[in-house]
């Protein structure tokens, strides 16, 4: 297993020194690489895979270089889409865009290895999948909010005037009938 950690959502001015200071408390670091084009992600490689797993558990979702960062174990496979997130292969967050067949083939191989380590990896994968699901829910809620706000004043007036005239005609017909 690869002892490489993907760090995503970083600001463009993040440095390898900053990352090394944050990540070295989990074990000996072999290499830190910060992407420049496009910026926003990095890889931290440890000597020992257990150190990488500890770093992921402790730092995923925490503030790194002033922003809330995503920290995941890297699978070493590049993913399409402009290079952002390349190298982590959708291990947790991007599970829904993978074919279920491909995922099963890779998973069955790892099942035959050490069960305890696999179980903790499954748990962290589930947690990150839940987090990404929550994030996408928040995003769609935000889109709905901005959509309703972005209606033009004329459109808003039109919908109000329709309901106003409807209620006026109803109240008029009620008052005309004798009680």
UniProtKB/Swiss-Prot annotation:
Superkingdom of the organism of origin:
Eukaryota
Q: Main localisation, per the record?
A: nucleus
Bias type Basic residues, positions: 161-173
Does Zinc appear among the keywords?
Answer: no
Which Pfam families is this protein grouped with?
RRM_1 (PF00076)
What is a single molecular function from GO for this protein?
RNA binding
The RRM domain, residue ranges: 3-76
Compositionally biased region (Gly residues): 78-93
Q: Which UniProt keywords apply?
A: Developmental protein, Differentiation, mRNA processing, mRNA splicing, Nucleus, Phosphoprotein, RNA-binding, Sexual differentiation
Subcellular localization, per the record?
Nucleus
The record's Gene Ontology cellular component field reads: nuclear speck; nucleus
The record's section on InterPro entries has: Nucleotide-bd_a/b_plait_sf (IPR012677), RBD_domain_sf (IPR035979), RRM_dom (IPR000504), SRSF (IPR050907)
Q: Which Gene3D superfamilies match?
A: 3.30.70.330
- Family per record: Belongs to the splicing factor SR family.
General remark: RNA-mediated interference (RNAi) of rsp-5 and rsp-6 result in fertile animals that exhibit excessive sperm and delayed oocyte production, and sterile animals that develop morphological abnormalities of somatic gonads. Rsp-2/rsp-6 RNAi caused severe abnormalities in somatic gonad structures and in some cases animals were arrested or dead at the larval stage.
What this protein is reported to do is described as: Plays a functionally redundant role in shifting germ cell sexual differentiation in hermaprodites. Required for the development of somatic gonad structures and for progression from larval stage to adulthood.
Record protein name field? Probable splicing factor, arginine/serine-rich 6
Question: Origin organism of this chain?
Answer: Caenorhabditis elegans
Query: Taxonomically, what lineage is the organism?
Result: Eukaryota, Metazoa, Ecdysozoa, Nematoda, Chromadorea
């Amino acid at each position: 297993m690869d002892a490489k950690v993907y760090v995503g959502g970083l600001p463009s001015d993040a440095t390898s020194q900053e990352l090394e200071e944050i990540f070295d408390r989990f074990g000996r670091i072999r290499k830190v690489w910060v992407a420049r084009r496009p910026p926003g992600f990095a890889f931290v490689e440890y000597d020992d895979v257990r150190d990488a797993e500890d770093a992921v558990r402790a730092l995923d979702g925490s503030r790194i270089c002033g922003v809330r960062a995503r920290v995941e174990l890297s699978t070493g496979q590049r993913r399409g889409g402009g290079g952002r997130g390349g190298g982590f292969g959708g291990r947790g967050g991007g599970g829904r865009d993978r074919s279920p067949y491909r995922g099963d083939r890779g998973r069955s191989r790892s099942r035959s290895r050490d069960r305890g380590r696999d179980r903790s990896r499954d748990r962290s994968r589930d947690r990150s999948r839940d987090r990404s699901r929550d994030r996408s829910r928040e995003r769609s809620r935000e889109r709905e909010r901005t959509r309703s706000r972005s209606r033009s004043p004329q459109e808003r007036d039109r919908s109000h005037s329709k309901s106003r005239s409807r209620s006026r005609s109803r109240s008029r017909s009620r008052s005309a009938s004798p009680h």
